[in-house]
Amino acid sequence: MTKLRKIIHIDMDYFFAQVEEKANPSLKDKPFAVGGTNPKRGVISTCNYIAREYGVRSAMPTAIAMQKCPNLILLNTDFAKYKAASAVIRDIFYSFTDKVEPLSLDEAYLDVTDVKEYKNSATLIAQAIKQEIFNKTGLTGSAGVAPNKLLAKIASDINKPNGLYVVTPKQVDSFVKDLPVKKLFGVGKVSQEKLKSMGVETCLDLQQLSLATLVDKFGKFGSSLYNYARGIDNREVNPVRIRKSVSVENTYLEDLKTLGACLEKLPSLYDKLTSRMTEEHYKSIIGIVVKFTDTKFNKTSLTRVAKILDKEMLKNLIIELHQKRNHPIRLIGIGVKLGEIDDKQMDLF
């Protein structure tokens, strides 16, 4: 019999903005956002909940955010400050268990299956972690507790901010049936639209499709979809996860018709990328990459050997890649390759 796992997903609330709010308490009752300080070309990185009441959202162009909230305060990003807070939070995670899988500065999975303290209760452990984070940083985070990573991550988003949501093994079936398929790990806009065209919008809808049908339509991912629709996820919390890359991308509502329009997106993408990188990532950079998807869904990318994350090199890659395109751009992605440089590895790029 498979051992029942106890997984916690911690997601800090409006992390960058909350760190800024803690550093400057006068912001607490004002709508403000981090990033996107250029009112014409900027893009919001994150914002506090007061700003969200006006309709301001992450990844929103600053011009639109200012229309929705004319008195919105814009702050420059301060990644040194965010990384310092993240380091404290990560140390707290490791004080509870060695089985920690960081996903970014403000998010991590913890496997507490074998933790004997707190009556071996994942719920009590999650409460204790949240309290310890608040005691040491003054920051709040939301936690999801479940038998696997898939459900824990979904659960952590339910009672934000400063929330805790528990999915017990007996609740899995009832919990997943009404979930929109877009909540499932690996389901992006393309997969979501494809499923919708098949009459699938919820996990209950997805459960009606056979494994053979899903594999036929989605390949290897079809098998995962079959399991996810039933709340099954066998992925382990990987405390020694070796990442081969860190990347970010954005799909734009308005097609980018000029090189200048593409270059204007680089600062916000760069900020988003650096926010996802840890100190270890910076030490193991072996290359940088830029990719485009155009309005005809053609995908192209360029990679260069590099030992540092160089914004100017990213800019030059965008310029070079843009020269190869015949159609407006809909998606831009940037990232870094991680590992040890050797000729064979670079050929794989």
Curated annotation (Swiss-Prot):
Feature type site, description Substrate discrimination: F16
PANTHER family: DNA POLYMERASE KAPPA, DNA REPAIR POLYMERASE UMUC / TRANSFERASE FAMILY MEMBER
GO MF annotation: an example: magnesium ion binding
UniProt-annotated catalytic positions: E107
Name of the protein: DNA polymerase IV
Function as written in the Swiss-Prot or TrEMBL entry: Poorly processive, error-prone DNA polymerase involved in untargeted mutagenesis. Copies undamaged DNA at stalled replication forks, which arise in vivo from mismatched or misaligned primer ends. These misaligned primers can be extended by PolIV. Exhibits no 3'-5' exonuclease (proofreading) activity. May be involved in translesional synthesis, in conjunction with the beta clamp from PolIII.
SUPFAM superfamilies: DNA/RNA polymerases (SSF56672), Lesion bypass DNA polymerase (Y-family), little finger domain (SSF100879)
Cofactor(s) demanded: Mg(2+)
Subcellular location: Cytoplasm
Family: Belongs to the DNA polymerase type-Y family.
InterPro entries in the record: DNA/RNA_pol_sf, DNA_pol_Y-fam_lit_finger_sf, DNA_pol_Y-fam_little_finger, DNA_polymerase-Y, DNApol_IV, IMS_HHH_1, Rev_trsase/Diguanyl_cyclase, UmuC
Record text on cofactor binding: Binds 2 magnesium ions per subunit.
Keyword entries, A-Z: Cytoplasm, DNA damage, DNA repair, DNA replication, DNA-binding, DNA-directed DNA polymerase, Magnesium, Metal-binding, Mutator protein, Nucleotidyltransferase, Transferase
Gene: dinB
Domain UmuC positions: 7-188
Keyword DNA-binding: yes
CDD domains: PolY_Pol_IV_kappa
Record-listed Mg(2+) binding positions: D11, D106
NCBIfam families, alphabetized: PRK02406.1
Biological process, per Gene Ontology: DNA-templated DNA replication; error-prone translesion synthesis; SOS response
GO cellular component annotations of the record: cytosol
Known catalytic reactions: DNA(n) + a 2'-deoxyribonucleoside 5'-triphosphate = DNA(n+1) + diphosphate
